């Protein structure tokens, strides 16, 4: 339905424009029908409570459409608005009112004959919007005539004028219906455009949201990029430091490789030295074992030598005692010899006269001696004669009629003891005395310092009395006076004395095994 031209700039237009601006701000475009229904609800709800009584709405529609309460359509609308039948207490909100009114208008359009009523209702609604809210005159049917409504009361006498005006109104109504259809089509196109615009706006809003999200994401990416730049700078610095450290580590590694090579060379030398030391230690161990065995043998030999030395010490002590006894005996014999020398010196003067008788007596004494002693004496005399013939000048000297003094006698005793004959089967004197034999130069030098020399048992034979007689080859050192006038008994006494000294001074050789240590080279330090 079109609004009058004079009312285009009125409060209704302003309210409509304001509602449109508010709807645009909310993003919702309303149709003309919804605008009329909203204006009807707002006219019935001046306090803006959001709920309106059903009776109030029905009274307003009755006043606008000119229908009575008995109208079937209004009763249907009342039943739709008050399905529970609450009566005057029934209320309805805007959403329910809009839904019920849309359904009611659709049902009336299907039944037909609602165009005039709608036009009248729309004109009344638009006219009622110009009135102040809450005006009681709007609800009064008597005052509807002044606002463009019709009085349902019976017509007055000016019927002809009313019919003519009614025809004019019908013509204008038809004209306005065509214009209304055009406007509805334009409204539909506008609604379609607004729907498209809404879709575009929603798409733009979505795009704006996506753009904002992309912008926020870009900002986040930018911040992350800045962080990555700072991180890259720090990583570059770390890379530089790591490169420097790597170069330093490489130099250190080269130095360590050189040190390792030197250490390997030293290790090889040390291994060679260790092998040499090991071999040397093995050699020393073997030498140590050999020396241990030698030491054990030497200790054993030393023990045996100690036993031998103790035995020899005891034997030497016994010989010392015997020697003292012999010395005492020889002292007594020397005294007797000196006494006899004095007697001989006294009787020397009368010896010339009795030389012949002495010769005879001497021959007799010689015959009386044992055969061995006689042979000895004859050998001595022959040797003395040979010495006198060999040394005539010495024979001219005065023959000593005295025996040697005490020193010469001691030397003679020692000489006789040394020159005593031994049995041809006896061992070497060095074996008895314990002297080491000289090593032959052909023998190879041995590595050992001490070599035990163990000799076998030496069979010793006791001297026979027949062998202890004066042997002519070993008695050349005996000093006997060459005076031919010595009495034979005195000479025999002297010979017996010498024989007793020789027999008593002879010591038996040892009969135990002879042990000896022979140094073949200087002992080790």
Curated annotation (Swiss-Prot):
One of its GO terms (biological process) is telomere localization. Residues 505-525 are perinuclear space. GO terms for cellular component: chromosome, telomeric region; lateral element; meiotic nuclear membrane microtubule tethering complex; meiotic spindle pole; nuclear outer membrane. Pfam families: EF-hand_9 (PF14658), KASH_CCD (PF14662). It is found in: Nucleus outer membrane; Nucleus; Chromosome, Telomere; Nucleus envelope. Residues 385-408 have a biased composition (Basic and acidic residues). Keywords: Chromosome, Coiled coil, Meiosis, Membrane, Nucleus, Telomere, Transmembrane, Transmembrane helix. GO terms for molecular function: dynein complex binding. Residues 164-360 form a coiled coil. Residues 127-156, 384-409, 423-444 are annotated as: Disordered. InterPro entries: KASH5, KASH5_coiled-coil, KASH5_EF-hand-like_dom. It is a single-pass type IV membrane protein. Residues 1-483 are cytoplasmic. The chain crosses the membrane at residues 484-504. It comes from the Eukaryota. Core component the LINC complex which is composed of inner nuclear membrane SUN domain-containing proteins coupled to outer nuclear membrane KASH domain-containing nesprins. SUN and KASH domain-containing proteins seem to bind each other promiscuously; however, differentially expression of LINC complex constituents is giving rise to specific assemblies. At least SUN1/2-containing core LINC complexes are proposed to be hexameric composed of three protomers of each KASH and SUN domain-containing protein. The C-terminal 22 AA is required and sufficient for localization to telomeres at the nuclear envelope. As a component of the LINC (LInker of Nucleoskeleton and Cytoskeleton) complex, involved in the connection between the nuclear lamina and the cytoskeleton. The nucleocytoplasmic interactions established by the LINC complex play an important role in the transmission of mechanical forces across the nuclear envelope and in nuclear movement and positioning. Required for telomere attachment to nuclear envelope in the prophase of meiosis and for rapid telomere prophase movements implicating a SUN1/2:KASH5 LINC complex in which SUN1 and SUN2 seem to act at least partial redundantly. This is Protein KASH5. It comes from Bos taurus. The gene is KASH5.
């Amino acid at each position: 339905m079109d609004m009058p031209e004079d009312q285009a700039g009125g409060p209704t237009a302003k309210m409509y424009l304001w509602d449109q601006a508010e709807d645009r701000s909310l993003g919702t475009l309303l149709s003309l029908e919804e605008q009329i229904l909203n204006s009807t609800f707002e006219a019935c709800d001046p306090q803006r409570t959001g709920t309106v009584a059903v009776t109030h709405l029905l009274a307003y529609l009755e006043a606008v459409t000119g229908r009575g309460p008995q109208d079937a359509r209004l009763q249907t609308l009342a039943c739709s608005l008050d399905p529970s039948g609450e009566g005057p207490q029934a209320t309805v909100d805007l959403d329910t009112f809009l839904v019920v009114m849309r359904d009611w208008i659709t049902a009336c359009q299907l039944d037909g004959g609602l165009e005039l009523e709608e036009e009248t209702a729309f004109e009344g609604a638009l006219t009622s919007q110009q009135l102040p809210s809450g005006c009681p005159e709007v609800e009064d049917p008597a005052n509807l005539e002044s606002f463009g409504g019709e009085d349902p009361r019976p017509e007055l006498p000016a019927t002809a004028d009313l019919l003519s005006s009614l025809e004019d109104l019908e013509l204008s109504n038809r004209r306005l219906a065509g214009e209304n259809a055009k406007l509805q089509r334009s409204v539909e196109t506008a609604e379609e455009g607004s729907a498209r615009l809404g879709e575009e706006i929603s798409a733009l809003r979505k795009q704006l949201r996506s753009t904002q999200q992309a912008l926020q994401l870009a900002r986040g990416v930018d911040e992350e990029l800045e962080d990555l730049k700072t991180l890259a700078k720090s990583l570059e610095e770390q890379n530089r430091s790591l490169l420097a450290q790597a170069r330093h580590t490489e130099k250190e590694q080269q130095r360590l490789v050189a040190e390792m090579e030197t250490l390997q060379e030293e290790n090889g030398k040390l291994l060679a030295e260790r092998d040499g030391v090991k071999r040397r230690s093995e050699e020393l161990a073997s030498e140590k074992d050999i020396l241990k065995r030698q030491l054990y043998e030497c200790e054993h030999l030393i023990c045996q030598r100690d036993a031998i030395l103790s035995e020899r010490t005891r034997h030497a002590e016994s010989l010392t005692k015997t020697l003292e006894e012999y010395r005492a005996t020889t002292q007594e014999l020397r005294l007797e010899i000196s006494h006899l020398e004095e007697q001989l010196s006294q009787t020397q003067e009368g010896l010339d006269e009795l030389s012949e008788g002495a010769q005879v007596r001497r021959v007799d004494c010689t015959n009386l001696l044992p055969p061995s002693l006689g042979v000895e004496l004859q050998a001595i005399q022959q040797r003395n004669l040979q010495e006198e013939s060999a040394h005539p000048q010495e024979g001219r000297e005065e023959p000593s009629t005295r025996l040697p003094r005490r020193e010469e006698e001691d030397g003679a005793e020692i000489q006789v003891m040394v020159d005593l004959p031994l049995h041809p089967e006896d061992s070497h004197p060095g074996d008895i005395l314990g002297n080491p034999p000289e090593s032959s130069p052909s023998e190879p030098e041995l590595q050992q310092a001490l070599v035990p020399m163990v000799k076998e048992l030496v069979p010793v034979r006791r001297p026979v009395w027949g062998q202890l007689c004066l042997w002519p080859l070993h008695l050349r050192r005996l000093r006997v006076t060459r005076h031919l006038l010595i009495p034979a008994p005195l000479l025999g006494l002297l010979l017996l004395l010498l024989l007793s000294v020789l027999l008593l001074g002879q010591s038996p050789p040892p009969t135990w095994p002879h042990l000896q240590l022979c140094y073949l080279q200087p002992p080790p330090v």
